[in-house]
């Protein structure tokens, strides 16, 4: 027992894979904070910079007993673990000087402010790259740093639906599309930013210094959810898949069904899953028909 405990303790005390990497996070809500949390989870030293009003997630909740409190927001806590913090008003000369001092120290800056706002603060990549030539800047916005929508303010829902993903995944055929249930575009943008940002950090010696990693949350969703199904088909044949509703056509039966104590998600894709479902249903005779013996014929006859 003592040997096992010692081994676990030894693993816990080892530095993370990103130990020694210094990160400044200057973001709000989800995309930049979660991206920075991925760095901190792997051992990077992350300093979160908040404007005097604080991260908007502090006011978003959820809160214990539904009582709003700036220090008790669940959304803020989940995306900001393992970080140090400082308040800094970058709109003032003293605040900007402090922020620039942090940039000179850092390997990475992660931010999700509007491009025009960063330019107004003189903190856009063109303005700060000379401060620290090895600095990697990860800018995560709904629509990217360039293009027709780059100057537009937007939120997770705007980025998600602009990608076209909701035309396939949100709601049932013939009905109004639905909102997705979480900050999907922001989280996918954050993961994309962390992945390419870490590559940029470790590639600095190859490219001769730092660089800007420009992440569009809408494009991250389009690449993950829309690309394989729709972009190629539309480009080649003018065809795109419509909404299929809940479930997977190839995985029939795959859907949400009412049951005695609520609802159940059912997916019987593999042979073992199908046989288990048959058993739960009492092995009805119709389940022995040839058309139901593999997932392809089940899908064709669903």
Name what the model sees in each region.
Residues 1-206:
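N-terminal helix-loop segment corresponding to the beta1-alpha1 unit
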Residues 12, 75, 211, 252-253:
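Residue-level marker for the onset of beta-strands and adjacent loop->beta junctions
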Residues 53, 142-144, 217-222, 261-263, ...:
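Glycine-rich beta-alpha junction loops
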Residues 58-63, 234-241:
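Short Pro/Gly-enriched beta-strand edge/turn motifs at strand-loop
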Residues 76, 241-249, 254-256:
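Short Gly/Pro-enriched turn/cap motifs at secondary-structure boundaries
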Residues 174-183, 205-221, 243-249, 290-294:
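Conserved Rossmann-fold dehydrogenase catalytic segment
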Residues 252-302:
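Aromatic-enriched alpha-helical interface/lid elements that frame and gate functional surfaces
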